[in-house]
């Protein structure tokens, strides 16, 4: 156009573009057409036709908004991009009637690629910022956790990890394990508030154990660790290490541990013993019912396991109904009634935990051995049932008989101190501790009562047999053979009391106090025979009056006092069948004879090996 052209009109300057609106008004579109130079008759891709405002079917006007994209991409300062975006805002660019190169897809792809790059850069920068800040936070938390686990909560030494429920060092871990496993009782010489530090932790073991428990170390974790995972592998290891093991390395509770191990492996666990009809139980019972042990007094130096069944003069068949063996004589003599226990030489202090464990173990084995090797020939099933129901009575009588030898009073005092410490640490409730203390007091009271009666070894033996065969419990087995043995034992006890020298001495000291002047009078004269019978009857009655005192005790509490740390969750009734089947003579021949110079303070390795191999 020229200045002389009548159609030329001076155009006002275009208003600024408003990108804040999602849709552009038609007047704005007309004004936008002046931004792009054009020549008449030459349509370009950037000059929309007159019907630009007409909506085209299938085209969404809000599909591409340059204002929003410019704000997101921050490209307001770039005029080229703004022009391209303004051009792509027209939906007719992609219409087939438009002449020109199809620039719309390329522009959209470029813008999308640019937007993706900027978003990727933004995400990368955010990740870098997170990575730069997160290691510091992680390191701080890990350092705090390491700092929390570095010190032992008991003594403050460097901790090696979490042991038995608390972060502790190796020293406190080993100390706690030894104390719980061996049930060692400690006594504080101060006010039970001794400092437990890295440098003073060994001064007071009582306060150290108390602090271990108070800081969260669990004793049940130690007990669970004692149970073997694989019994067969332990048996192989025991067989390989028996030749290299010395007697001083044997633990005090090794006897009952071997019994428990043998019980779990040979008979297939507790179920085989609980079920009397199981084939394993019947097979093992049949193997041992054909063997009758010799009595103690006939040949004590002979290992019964080496004597064939036919060589024993007192052997009887399985179906034998006789209660007493065929050889003549009483059930017990002074030789057969010997009940002797050897005290460990290196642990004779009753306050030593090893002493308590060794004494209780030997006493239980010796009691079962004493009943089994008596001259009474009871069937194996009958003897097993009687021992399961009467083991507590026999064990109490054994404690009374050996009270002076094992220092029962000091032993019970030590056990009381251990129980008191356990109650303070939460192992025992107040009610349970009171019940255990009551049973211990009754043991001391009964020991004084037995000491006043001054029973001999033969009287103790007959008292055990009478109590063993007495039908004074609801679970007692009533059979003709047990009644016959009980009657025979009672009769022989009365005969022994009548003929014993102690009764005659007692009669001469107390009852034969007749003046010479009255001896001439036949009406007031008391013959020695009548006096002897009266005194024997009185002593016999006083001996039998001791049996009801055995009902003072609860078998479960006796197990808690003496055997809780030795047999664990097992019961004495479960162990008894094993003890009956074992060759116990190898333990009590030459190894446990009282007064022999070669008596060993612990059971020898050869005896333990023989027990494992003979079963």
Curated annotation (Swiss-Prot):
Record's keyword terms, sorted: DNA-binding, Metal-binding, Nucleus, Receptor, Transcription, Transcription regulation, Zinc, Zinc-finger
A single MF term (Gene Ontology): RNA polymerase II cis-regulatory region sequence-specific DNA binding
Major localization listed first in the record, in broad terms: nucleus
Tissue: Seam cells, excretory cell, rectal epithelia, chemosensory neurons, gut, head/tail hypodermis.
UniProt DNA-binding residue ranges: 149-224
Function of the molecule: Orphan nuclear receptor that may have a role in dauer formation.
Family annotation (InterPro entries): NHR-like_dom_sf (IPR035500), NR2C1/2-like_DBD (IPR048245), Nucl_hrmn_rcpt_lig-bd (IPR000536), Nuclear_hormone_rcpt_NR2 (IPR050274), Znf_hrmn_rcpt (IPR001628), Znf_NHR/GATA (IPR013088)
Zinc finger (NR C4-type) stretch: 152-172, 188-212
SMART domains on file: ZnF_C4 (SM00399)
GO BP term, example: cell differentiation
Family to which this protein belongs: Belongs to the nuclear hormone receptor family.
Organism: Caenorhabditis elegans
Pfam families xrefs: Hormone_recep, zf-C4
Any single Gene Ontology cellular-component annotation: nucleus
Name of the protein described by the UniProt record: Nuclear hormone receptor family member nhr-41
UniProt-annotated location(s): Nucleus
Annotated region described as Disordered, given as residue ranges: 310-329
């Amino acid at each position: 156009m020229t200045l002389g052209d009548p159609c030329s009109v001076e155009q006002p300057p275009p208003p600024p573009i408003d990108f804040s609106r999602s849709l552009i008004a038609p007047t704005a579109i007309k004004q936008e057409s002046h931004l792009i130079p054009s020549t008449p008759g030459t349509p370009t891709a950037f000059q929309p036709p007159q019907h630009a405002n007409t909506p085209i079917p299938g085209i969404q006007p809000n599909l591409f908004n340059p204002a929003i994209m410019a704000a997101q991409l921050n490209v307001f300062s770039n005029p080229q991009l703004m022009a391209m975006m303004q051009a792509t805002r027209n939906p007719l660019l992609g219409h087939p009637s438009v002449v020109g190169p199809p620039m719309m897809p390329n522009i959209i792809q470029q813008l999308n690629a640019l937007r993706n790059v900027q978003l990727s850069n933004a995400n990368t920068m955010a990740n870098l910022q997170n990575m730069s800040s997160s290691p510091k936070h992680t390191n701080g938390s890990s350092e705090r956790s390491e700092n929390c686990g570095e010190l032992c909560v008991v003594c403050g030494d460097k901790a090696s990890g979490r042991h038995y429920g608390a972060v502790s060092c190796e020293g406190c871990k080993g100390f706690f394990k030894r104390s719980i496993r061996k049930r060692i009782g400690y006594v504080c010489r101060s006010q039970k508030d001794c400092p437990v530090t890295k440098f003073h932790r060994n001064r007071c073991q009582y306060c150290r154990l108390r602090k271990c428990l108070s800081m969260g170390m669990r004793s049940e974790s130690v007990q669970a660790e004692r149970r073997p995972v694989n019994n067969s592998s332990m048996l192989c290891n025991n067989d390989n290490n028996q030749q290299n093991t010395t007697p001083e390395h044997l633990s005090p509770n090794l006897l009952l541990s071997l019994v428990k191990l043998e019980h779990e492996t040979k008979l297939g666990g507790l179920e085989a013993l609980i079920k009397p009809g199981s084939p394993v139980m019947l097979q093992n019972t049949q193997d041992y019912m054909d063997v009758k042990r010799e009595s103690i007094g006939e040949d004590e130096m002979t290992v019964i396991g080496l004597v064939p069944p036919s060589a024993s003069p007192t052997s009887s068949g399985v179906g034998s109904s006789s209660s007493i063996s065929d050889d003549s004589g009483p059930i017990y003599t002074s030789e057969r009634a010997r009940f002797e226990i050897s005290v460990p030489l290196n642990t004779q202090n009753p306050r030593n935990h090893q002493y308590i464990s060794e004494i209780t173990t030997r006493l239980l084995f010796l009691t079962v051995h004493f009943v089994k090797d008596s001259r009474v020939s009871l069937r194996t099933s009958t003897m097993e049932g009687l021992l399961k129901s009467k083991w507590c009575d026999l064990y109490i009588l054994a404690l009374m008989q050996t009270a002076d030898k094992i220092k029962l009073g000091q032993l019970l005092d030590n056990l009381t101190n251990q129980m008191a410490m356990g109650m303070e640490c939460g192992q025992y409730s107040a009610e349970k501790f009171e019940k255990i203390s009551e049973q211990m007091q009754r043991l001391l009271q009964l020991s004084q009562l037995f000491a006043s009666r001054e029973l001999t070894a033969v009287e103790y033996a007959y008292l055990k047999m009478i109590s063993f065969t007495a039908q004074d419990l609801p679970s007692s087995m009533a059979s003709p053979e047990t009644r016959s043995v009980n009657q025979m034992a009672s009769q022989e006890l009365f005969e022994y009391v009548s003929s014993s020298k102690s009764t005659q001495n007692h009669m001469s000291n107390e009852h034969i106090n007749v003046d010479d002047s009255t001896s001439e009078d036949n009406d007031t004269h008391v013959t020695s025979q009548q006096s002897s019978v009266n005194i024997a009857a009185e002593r016999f009655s006083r001996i039998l009056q001791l049996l009801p005192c055995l009902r003072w005790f609860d078998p479960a509490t006796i197990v808690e006092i003496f055997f809780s740390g030795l047999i664990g969750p097992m019961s004495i009734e479960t162990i008894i069948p094993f003890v009956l089947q074992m060759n116990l003579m190898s333990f009590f021949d030459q190894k446990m004879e009282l007064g022999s110079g070669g008596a060993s303070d612990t059971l020898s390795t050869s005896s333990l090996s023989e027990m494992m191999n003979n079963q």
